[in-house]
Design a protein with these regions (language model features):
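Contiguous, small/hydrophobic- and glycine-enriched helical/loop subdomains that border
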Residues: 5
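Classical nucleotidyltransferase
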Residues: 9-119, 203-207, 212
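Phosphate/ribose-recognition catalytic cores of enzymes acting on nucleotide-derived substrates
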Residues: 58, 109-215
Length: 215
């Protein structure tokens, strides 16, 4: 995976400079596959026709892929993000062509879940001090992969724990059913199935405990 950081320099590249700097000099591309509505370069000036012309000049092949549709509209990253933000996991999974998952290393937490009777594995989902928001928030039915021979069902919360921390970072906290073990520093994938409810600030830990039990 080659990650391009979107910055002022990248945004200002002309279509020709984008191809020369990124595809030719950077990746030494010989075969380029893009969606049929692909646009590139400053002000989205480049299209498939121009990319094919530049491919002949710089000796790489261009293969456009046809658009895929769902409910009579093209599948796009913005539609997938919208479905995730709405908690519509089945629709997001359909457009992704795979289950939506979050993976990461299990952190040492404050043991609050254990105190409440619902121990959780905690995973950071954004870089420290990031101002970004995760693709999803709320409480979900999930399965955790990478712990044993079979996935383990559970309930996960993606949020900032407003009941106990007014300015906390976003975390993925997952309570696994019928599991007792130490997963610290292990990599775990959490697969999302359906949204149960939004994250909520409760007046007391007892109210929080009751809500978790209902979940």
């Amino acid at each position: 995976v080659y990650i391009l950081r979107f910055n002022e320099h990248l945004a200002s590249l002309s279509p020709c400079d984008f191809v020369k700097e990124i595809l030719v000099d950077g990746l030494h591309a010989r075969w380029v596959t893009v969606g049929e509505n692909f646009r590139f370069g400053d002000k989205r000036a480049g299209d498939i026709k121009l990319l094919e012309q530049l491919g002949k000049e710089f000796h790489f092949e261009v293969h456009p892929m046809p658009m895929l549709f769902h409910t009579h509209a093209p599948i796009s990253s913005s539609r997938i993000r919208h479905a995730l933000a709405e908690g519509d996991i089945p629709t997001a999974n359909y457009m992704l062509g795979r289950p939506y998952m979050i993976s990461g290393r299990v952190l040492h937490g404050k043991q609050l879940g254990r105190t409440l009777g619902f121990p959780t594995i905690n995973q950071r989902i954004l870089p420290p001090h990031s101002k970004a928001k995760p693709a999803i928030e709320g409480v979900y039915a999930v399965k955790a992969h990478g712990i044993g021979p079979r996935p383990i069902e559970g309930v996960a919360c993606v949020g900032r724990r407003p009941t106990v921390d007014d300015h906390g970072e976003y975390l993925l906290e997952t309570h696994l059913f019928n599991f007792h073990g130490d997963l610290y520093d292990q990599d775990v994938k959490v697969e999302f199935f359906s949204k149960i409810r939004d994250e909520k600030k409760f007046c007391s830990l007892e109210e929080l405990r009751a809500a978790i039990a209902d979940d």
